[in-house]
Amino acid sequence: MVNGINHMTFSVSNMDKAVSFYKHVFMEAPLVLGEKTAYFTIGGTWLALNLQPDIDRKEIRQSYTHIAFSIEESQLDAFYTRLLEAGADILPGRKRQVETEGKSIYFRDPDGHLLEVHTGTLAERLAHYEKTAPDMLVNIDEQNKK
């Protein structure tokens, strides 16, 4: 049985630049720092950076595939400021259907990986669908609503 996400790994073109970015934006120091790898914990999740300087990174910028980190709404402005200071590519927000979806900031790291900080929760999203589109809820039990 799968117990959760073990870790995420991103290939990076410049280790020093990537480490500086993640350290500044997420206010976390690396746990492991080598010439070709770095490990962080962000919100309790293990993030690994591996040096791969020769990968074509053009296509990565065309996908909505991303990782979203939870953040308190009261912390959004400070986080946005850190993104600006780090020189992040901050993207326009995705249009939300309703306020209950939470607020987000989408941004790219120096290698083009799409990241998001998001204030909403799965429980809030499920409650929204339960009220507005109950036919969309399939295989939902009380455990999933927590």
From Swiss-Prot:
Residues 4-120 form the VOC domain. It comes from the Bacteria. The active site is at residue 116. InterPro entries: Fosfomycin_Res_Enzymes, Glyas_Bleomycin-R_OHBP_Dase, Glyas_Fos-R_dOase_dom, Metallothiol_Trafse_FosB, VOC. The keyword RNA-binding does not apply. Its main location: cytoplasm. One of its GO terms (biological process) is response to antibiotic. GO terms for cellular component: cytoplasm. Keywords: Antibiotic resistance, Cytoplasm, Magnesium, Metal-binding, Transferase. One of its GO terms (molecular function) is magnesium ion binding. It is found in: Cytoplasm. Mg(2+) binds at residues 7, 66, 116. Its EC number is 2.5.1.-. Its cofactor is Mg(2+). Homodimer. Metallothiol transferase which confers resistance to fosfomycin by catalyzing the addition of a thiol cofactor to fosfomycin. L-cysteine is probably the physiological thiol donor. Belongs to the fosfomycin resistance protein family. FosB subfamily. This is Metallothiol transferase FosB. The gene is fosB.
